[in-house]
Amino acid sequence: MHLALIIDDYLPHRTRVGAKMFHELACELYSLGYQITVITPGFSQKEYLVKDVIDNISIWRFKSGELKAHNKFKRAFNETLLSARAWKAIKNQLKYNTFQGIIYYSPSVFFGPLVKKIKKLCNCPSYLVLRDLFPQWCIDSGLIRKNSLIEKYFRYFEKYSYDQANHIGLMSEKNIEIFTKKYPLYNTHVLRNWANQTPTETSNIYREKLNLQDKVIYFYGGNIGKAQDMKNLIKLAKGMMMYENAHFLFVGQGDEVNLIKKLIVKWNLNNTTYIPSITQSEFKKLLSEVDIGLFSLAKEHSSHNFPGKLLGYMVQSIPILGSVNKDNDLIPLFNKFGAGFIHINGEDEKLLNSAIELYLNKNIRLQLGNNGLNLLKNEFDVTTIANYITKKLGV
């Protein structure tokens, strides 16, 4: 059985959570006996199609403009052309029996036309791994005006993407509730995020490199954007200034990088360090060295996301500290397993008190970290996810 995996972000050139998760899924499917081809954009290539192999996974990179540009018009333009550029690059590689199933990831919402063409040619089913409800989160955050032409534009492609899916997997029960209010006719179910459960051996490379040998490291790794409300975590770092061995380390890329850099300087935060994105292998080494995993979701969100970065924390038995939008079902899930301290965004004093408790009590850090690993094994196992998706596809 040959499966096509379609995503706008992939290793090794990108290290965002979606790229890591899809590669882990691809590797798991391969271990189960499937042939896997990942179809994804390439951003610095001259050829229309470049083929590559990573960990036995075949990768077809089609020529594309930059998707993560700060210029939002340029970004939207290039995303709109994703399907057209992909089809132009790969159509001569395809026959009626090339693929027996398609698994595609959203965001982006612009792969609907490509999925439709492949489904028609290969007569195969498709499964949509739906993570962020775009453009809804942009409307919630005020980045897109409700009922504007730009909303209607994105909504058209959003629905077109959903129309191509035989099955749609969302992150949580709350997200299904929100989704079905607007789109009631699709075949939806809960599909958690996932992770390979093999931890990385502990190292001290980054502690030595950054002169953090004796520090309690509060770590944030991943997308640094408006949806994460990064100022929320920088305020936490400011509140922890009196604790001399507490250090905040931010690693990643996104629209809010300049904001956190400015706030570090403005507030003279000598307990905070930012470094740009690093490779997946280096990221795993760094995760093995930190003490507390941070995350944040903007309070304006109406959807209820499960940040993929939490999986990396749980693999390494790192206790989790974060804040979410109101009624997010992460709170009861983490409370059930005792895997960390999660508060509603805006409860700054509670967040700070939890940060202090984790700083002062190593035993609590160890206990919460072990509980997080148990949560991972129960809810987010990549083997379970792979088997579930292939069962839905009937392959």
Map each language-model feature to its residues.
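Conserved donor-binding/catalytic core segment of Leloir-type glycosyltransferases
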Residues: 209-228, 233-237, 249
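N-terminal subdomain of nucleotide-sugar transferases
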Residues: 1-58, 240
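Membrane-proximal helix-turn-helix segments that form the acceptor-binding/catalytic region
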Residues: 110-113, 117-121, 148-168
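A short helix/loop element that forms part of the nucleotide-sugar donor recognition site in Leloir-type
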Residues: 49-51, 200-212
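Nucleotide-activated donor-binding/catalytic signature segment of Leloir-type glycosyltransferases, i.e.
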Residues: 251-252, 257-284
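Nucleotide-sugar-dependent
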Residues: 228, 279-288, 293-314, 319-332
